[in-house]
Amino acid sequence: MPIEQCYRLRMFPSDIVKNAMILWAGPKNHLVQYPLRGGKLFNLVAVFHSDKYVEGWNSTADPVELEARFAGTCETVQALLSKIGTWRMWVLCDREPVRHWSRGRSTLLGDAAHPMLQYLAQGACMAIEDGVALADKMADSNGSLADAFKEYDDARYKRTGKCQLLARLYGEFYHAEGVRRELRNDMLRGRSTEQSYDGLAWLYDGI
């Protein structure tokens, strides 16, 4: 059963195509670059469907598989990949949204409660929001952890579940093939950057 692999490395601005956040989408793969540390470094991330599974979060990647998965992509992507030596890799995982992640005097937050794919870049953001919501509920609970945790679950499960499911959808959108790919390109061609951001205002406006 194919899984999704993520390869990542950091590059200097002199090694990239353009000093900007750019995503190249292709059939069952995509490549994205985005700035780190105020633009002093760039993260380059390649995601593709793979038949391999490697346990862990920071394994040495297989450049042969990467080259094979991105064969036939545009010259810009090929030029970027040709500059690269050692990649790090991990397998992407999520699960179905759940309604509760608290029990008694114990609760979860972040990926432990609602693991999600990276396509919305919201895993860490949701964990931070969880922490804020949990602190608020505990402050209002009059010392009852069970009540605080129940209210915390109630306050968070829909928003985090929406992120989990939408991240999957974005993955399918990025990696589309055939007619789906053509329809995706037509839709994006007719949208401005502002329209794309507006569609996710519910997410990026925070809680």
Language-model features: locations:
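Conserved FAD-binding catalytic core of PHBH/FMO-like flavoproteins
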Residues: 1-85, 98
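Amphipathic alpha-helical interaction/coupling elements
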Residues: 69, 148-151, 182, 186
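Short, hydrophobic secondary-structure boundary micro-motifs
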Residues: 78-81, 163-164, 199-200
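C-terminal auxiliary extensions adjacent to catalytic cores
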Residues: 189-207
